[in-house]
Structures are given as C-alpha cells and as structure tokens.
C-alpha cells in the first residue's frame, strides 16, 4: 500500500512538472483521431459491421472470468488503483485547464495510457493477461507489448498490442485481433504528410486484411519490433 502511495505521488508530480516546464507545449498538436469519438478515416478503418465479422483475425473479446478468491483480490487492488487514477486524473485536468486548449488532447491521451497501465497492473501484468486472453503453445514466448489504439470504423479503440514468437495479438475491452506470424505479409510505418506528429503502423495479412495501429508511446520501438517479428515469421516459413 505504501508503494502504491509513493508511486501515485511520483507520477502525479512528474505529470504536473512536465506540463509546467515542457518548452514546446504551445506548438504541440495531437491527432484528433486518438481522442475524439468521430469515425476514423475509411482507408484506415477496421469495419465493425459485416466486414469485421468476415475478418478471420477479429473476434469479440470474451467476458472476463476468474475464481472467487482471485476476483476478490483483484477487485481490492483495482479499488486502490482506481482511487489513485482518479487523483492523478483530477490533478492532470486542473493542469490542463491552466495550460489551455493546446494541451487538451495530449493530456487526455496520456490519461488514457495511465488508465490502461492501471488496468494491466491490477489484472496481473502483460504476460498474465496475454496467456489468459489468447490461446498459446507451450514454447511460445511474449516478446513485447505496446499500449496503443486500433483504428476502427467506430473510432480509435485503446488496447494492448502483443508481439510473441508465434503471433501478433491485440486486445481491447471489445475486440480481439490474432494474426499468426506465417499469415503476416507486411508491416508499414506511415507518417501523415500534413502533420508529421501523426504516426501509424499498417499491418497487412497474406490475404490482404489491413489493420492500422496508432498512438504508440514509443513509435520507433514498435516499428522495429513488428518488422523484426515479420522477418522472423518469414524465416520460419522458408525453413
């Protein structure tokens, strides 16, 4: 409990410090797609209607289940983390009000990432969630995980992109995406010519299904990881 208090205070101070002292805050612009509820561009959208149902890599996220004791423990942890998240959120929103509209979008996106990290911590970490959510084989290893957004026709959806030795897998509260490595065709970084701050990663399967991911905290690291995974999958197919 002391560790949680210490962590919350440290993160809160760090957020307030960065907001107050960031030199380029007046020139910072955030992609509206990441924080608005308007539909994403059609060419970067995963349809949520008939097209999504026909996509073999997409499924609805299952309802979470757990035994009584684990659920009780997790609910207790979530309660503590939830209160912490609200305190951080209140502090950030106050700072946002002082900083002006320019900081509105990045702050909300940052709060979204904090909420996602809080949820992951409360549920036992990325490795545990990955193995509970997706079917895995004994020798499969989780190599990387990235909090990001998946572009859909209903708007960007926040979740986690998992990179393992066998698949790419994306998990949100509403959707699951699973692409075996041997089904990967290409991984393409894409940067908006109008606003270079808008960066995407396009993933294409061998049967030409497209997925657009955005809002990475470490964009370059995500691109490198996904491209390395694509090459590894190609090597396995050749062998």
Swiss-Prot record:
InterPro entries: GEM-like, GRAM, PH-like_dom_sf. Residues 128-191 form the GRAM domain. Gene3D superfamilies: Pleckstrin-homology domain (PH domain)/Phosphotyrosine-binding domain (PTB). It holds the Pfam family GRAM. It comes from the Eukaryota. Residues 29-68 are annotated as: Disordered. Belongs to the GEM family. This is Putative GEM-like protein 3. It comes from Arabidopsis thaliana.
């Amino acid at each position: 409990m002391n560790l949680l208090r210490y962590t919350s205070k440290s993160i809160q101070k760090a957020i307030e410090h960065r907001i107050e002292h960031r030199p380029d805050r007046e020139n910072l612009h955030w992609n509206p797609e990441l924080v608005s509820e308007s539909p994403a561009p059609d060419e970067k959208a995963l349809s949520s209607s008939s097209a999504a149902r026909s996509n073999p890599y997409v499924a609805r996220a299952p309802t979470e289940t757990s035994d009584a004791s684990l659920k009780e423990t997790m609910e207790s942890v979530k309660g503590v983390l939830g209160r912490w998240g609200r305190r951080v959120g209140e502090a950030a929103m106050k700072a946002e009000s002082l900083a002006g509209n320019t900081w509105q979008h990045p702050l909300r996106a940052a709060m979204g990432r904090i909420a996602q990290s809080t949820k992951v911590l409360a549920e036992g970490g990325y490795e545990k969630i990955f193995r509970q959510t997706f079917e895995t084989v004994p020798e499969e290893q989780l190599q990387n995980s990235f909090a990001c957004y998946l572009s859909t026709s209903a708007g960007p959806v926040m979740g986690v992109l998992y990179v393992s030795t066998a698949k790419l897998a994306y998990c949100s509260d509403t959707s699951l995406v699973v692409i075996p490595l041997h089904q990967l065709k290409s991984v393409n970084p894409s940067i908006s010519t109008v606003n270079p701050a808008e960066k995407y990663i396009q993933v294409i399967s061998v049967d030409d299904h497209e997925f657009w991911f955005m809002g990475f905290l470490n964009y370059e690291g995500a691109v490198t990881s996904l491209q390395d995974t694509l090459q590894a999958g190609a090597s396995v197919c050749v062998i």
